From Swiss-Prot:
It holds the Pfam family DEP. Belongs to the DSH family. It comes from Caenorhabditis elegans. The gene is mig-5. Keywords: Cell junction, Cell membrane, Cytoplasm, Developmental protein, Membrane, Wnt signaling pathway. This is Segment polarity protein dishevelled homolog mig-5.
Length: 672
């Protein structure tokens, strides 16, 4: 009942509109001396989160406009119709949660307050009447009902309550807590007090609870304040803090400090952030150290304070005792972001967040409903509290990589060729890529052209024959994605090839034959006979006759001797007269002069002594003493010395002409 007005007090009827509603609401307020202010209207209208406007005649456009009322002392104006009219426009994202969300209902909070005060006359059945408890929808994500125990009086939030191991819905979540025998709870609480508390704060597991009562939002959830302290004309910050379960709370406010002069910080408020340093991921000592550094810097400080709604001061003596017994886990960033997103979604659907007082969800349609077992729920709960183990993160990364590989389309000629080359360069591609030897020269990480053609036919979706595969391989060679060992420009199946630069990793592209484990890598050498030069042609072989074998003699020159004639001696690898792999260097030029039925190094008219093939040295061939001109032969050059013997025991024949008796010649047989 409204108190009677005095002589200087009068009642004024005010009509107000909420948002876009056309039907006004009426409220009777008291005004002194006939002057009504916004503060008088707020005394009767207790909802917050609105902007207030009144109609006023604008002299410029000669029409009524809506003028915002910002302070409580602003006077209410009459419209042209002679009535007091106020237009209320809701503020988007006001507070931290939509109006249809909350925590515990008022009877439930009352029960928990009585438990904290250890009252002997506790009413154990406040939920017996189902009509008194509003319907509450709880999103039952895996392990989330365990987190709800964090709001109880238990000092061990990780204790698993057997009464909550169920998958019921609606308003039955808190019923076992209220209907339990209080003597047993007190004994359990006293035993748990002896256990060592967790020193670091735990991550918050958010839960979504929708209630039909609006008072639970206004009085149950904290308000976040941003307080700016200039620190100019004050001697110190004047703030003492304490840590409770990893959270930072104000324990004392010193007089004449910046906090006392501001007046908005009270004992028991939680400090969430100082300047740009958030306390959500810091331990208690780290947060206190950050606060001490900010206070000693003598610079302006911005505090983010969480103020919990409490009852009258007479209900309890120490505010910190209440905070210690009821530590509410809070993730402010996720909280605010979720609230704004839900509000915007409701507006997009044409729903008014302020008018949604209840949410009805059919059975089995909860978006995060989980049918996991108790062990799975406990595992998921531990992961969300303590973080996901490294092994699970690596397994998830491997699974994601495998899924991405499955999404890659099949290898075709239309995709980037470098993808094809990298696919064949993988260790499990099926292409034989390994270290090989050719003419005692190490060819690291090479493969044969024939194997490449086979791989393309097997793995390319649009290549079905070897001819098309050879054409595609030639394109890879021309693009530089694969390279010939001796820089040939045409592709053949009988040559060695290596990958281009950047295809193989550093661990596989290295020329070092030592593996990562410290052992020597096995190098494969070709088992086929490798000729330095070509065998004798068929016509020349017929002239040799008598089953006289010929052999190739090499010199003592270094295999890396400089030779400038390789450009004109490069031939195709597929010559039928040459060996498959040795033909990369070209054919040999056989210099011979038939004398009788065997080959000699000189004739009768040549009086210069020619050394035996086994005695030919680089100096004798270079200065022309060997009787053969041209550049010095090497094992990789085409100018070689050929000696044939009529004796099958591999004897080298050399005619040594005596200068004194030119008519008599003698043959000396040198055994090689």
């Amino acid at each position: 009942m409204e108190p009677p007005c005095t002589s200087d007090c009068s009642q004024i009827k005010v009509f107000y509109y909420l948002d876009d509603e056309t039907t006004p609401y009426v409220s009777v307020i008291e005004a002194r001396e006939g002057v009504a202010t916004l503060g008088n209207f707020k005394n009767s209208f207790t909802k917050r989160g609105y902007k207030y406007y009144a109609k006023e005649l604008d002299p410029d456009i000669q029409r009524e406009v809506k003028v915002e009322l910002t302070t409580d002392s602003d006077r209410l104006r009459k419209s042209q119709n002679g009535f007091y009219e106020i237009f209320l426009v809701s503020t988007p994202g006001y507070g931290t949660l939509p109006r249809n969300s909350g925590t515990m209902t008022r009877p439930q909070r009352t029960a928990l307050d009585k438990r904290r005060r250890r009252s002997a006359d506790f009413d154990a059945t406040p939920y017996s009447d189902a009509s008194l408890a509003p319907s509450t929808i709880v999103s039952r994500r895996a392990g989330e009902h365990l987190a709800e125990l964090y709001t109880s009086n238990s000092e061990d939030p990780y204790q698993y309550d057997e009464h909550t191991r169920r998958t019921g819905d609606d308003s039955s979540l808190y019923e076992p807590l209220a209907a339990r025998d209080m003597n047993k709870i007190y004994d359990d609480d006293r035993r748990r007090k002896k256990q060592k508390k967790e020193r670091f704060r735990r991550p918050y597991v958010p839960s979504t609870i929708s209630s039909a009562t609006e008072s639970s939002v206004n009085s149950g959830l904290p308000r976040i304040l941003e307080i700016y302290l200039p620190m100019k004309n004050v001697p110190y910050l004047g703030l003492s803090v304490c840590t409770i379960d990893g959270h930072i709370f104000v324990s004392e406010i010193a007089p004449e400090g910046a906090v006392e002069k501001d007046g908005r910080v009270n004992v028991g408020d939680q400090i969430l952030q100082v300047n740009r340093v958030s306390f959500e991921e810091l331990s208690g000592p780290q947060a206190v150290r950050s606060l001490r550094e900010a206070a000693s810097s003598k610079r302006p400080i911005t505090l983010y304070i969480s103020k919990f709604a409490r009852g009258a001061p007479s209900e309890y003596d120490d505010p910190l005792a209440s905070m210690a017994s009821e530590t509410m886990p809070l993730d402010v960033g996720v909280w605010v972001e979720t609230a704004v997103q839900n509000t915007e979604k409701m507006k997009a659907l044409g729903l008014d967040p302020q008018e949604q007082t209840a949410t009805t969800i059919d059975d089995g349609t909860l978006p995060f409903t989980s049918t996991a077992s108790d062990d799975e729920e406990r595992m998921l709960y531990d992961q969300r509290r303590n973080g996901i183990p490294r092994a699970l993160i690596e397994e998830a990364e491997r699974k994601r990589e495998n899924e991405q590989n499955e999404k890659i389309e099949q290898l075709t000629e239309m995709i980037d060729p470098i993808i094809v080359v990298r696919s064949m360069a993988r260790p499990d591609s099926g292409l034989a890529v390994k270290n090989r030897k050719w003419l005692k020269i190490l060819v690291p990480m090479s493969f044969i052209g024939r194997d490449l053609v086979d791989w393309l036919v097997d793995h390319m979706a649009d290549i079905h024959n070897r001819k098309k595969a050879r054409i595609y391989a030639a394109r890879l060679l021309a693009a530089g994605l694969i390279r010939h060992v001796v820089s040939k420009l045409t592709f053949t199946e009988k040559c060695y090839y290596v990958f281009g630069d950047g295809i193989l990793g550093n661990d596989r592209n290295s020329t070092d034959t030592t593996g990562t484990s410290g052992t020597t890598m096995r190098v494969e050498a070709t088992t086929e006979v490798t000729y330095v030069g070509s065998p004798a042609p068929h016509a020349l072989a017929a002239r040799v006759g008598r089953n006289i074998p010929h052999r190739l003699e090499t010199t003592t020159l270094s295999p890396v001797a400089h030779d400038q004639t390789w450009l004109r001696r490069r031939r195709d690898c597929e010559s039928p007269m040459t060996n498959d792999y040795a033909s990369m260097v070209g054919e040999s030029q056989i210099g011979m002069n038939p004398v009788g039925n065997y080959h000699v190094f000189g004739t009768k008219n040549n009086h210069r002594q020619v050394p035996a093939p086994s005695q030919v040295t680089s100096s004798s061939l270079t200065n022309g003493s060997g009787g053969l001109g041209g550049p010095p032969p090497t094992p990789l050059s085409s100018t070689m010395v050929l000696a044939a013997s009529p004796i099958q025991s591999q004897n080298a024949v050399n005619h040594d002409f005596d200068g004194e008796n030119s008519s008599n010649s003698r043959t000396r047989i040198l055994r090689t």
